[in-house]
Amino acid sequence: MKVVLIVCLVWVMAMMELVSCECWSQADCSDGHCCAGSSFSKNCRPYGGDGEQCGPRNKYEVYSTGCPYEENLMCSVINRCQSA
């Protein structure tokens, strides 16, 4: 029984790793996504759509609160995507 529980726990942890799409840099993420999060826990997240949380674009491609906005949008002063 303990072996089954351990195997299940390892499987769940492996699935969480796949779903979270952890990243170290922008190169680790697919198109339409950016690498964002704290120094210790970065994940590939989609670019912000209308009304969603965003962060301003920067030349270093380092984002903590959210990805930049999609094309034809801008990031407001309250870090929400809106029409340009």
UniProtKB/Swiss-Prot annotation:
Disulfide linkage: C23-C35, C29-C44, C34-C67, C54-C75
Protein's UniProt keywords contain Secreted: yes
Highest taxon in the source lineage: Eukaryota
Keywords on record: Disulfide bond, Secreted, Signal, Toxin
Cleaved signal peptide residues: 1-21
Name of the protein described by the UniProt record: U8-theraphotoxin-Hhn1b
Localization of this protein: Secreted
Entry comment describing in which tissues the protein is expressed: Expressed by the venom gland.
Lineage: Eukaryota, Metazoa, Ecdysozoa, Arthropoda, Chelicerata
Keyword Signal on entry: yes
GO cellular component: extracellular region
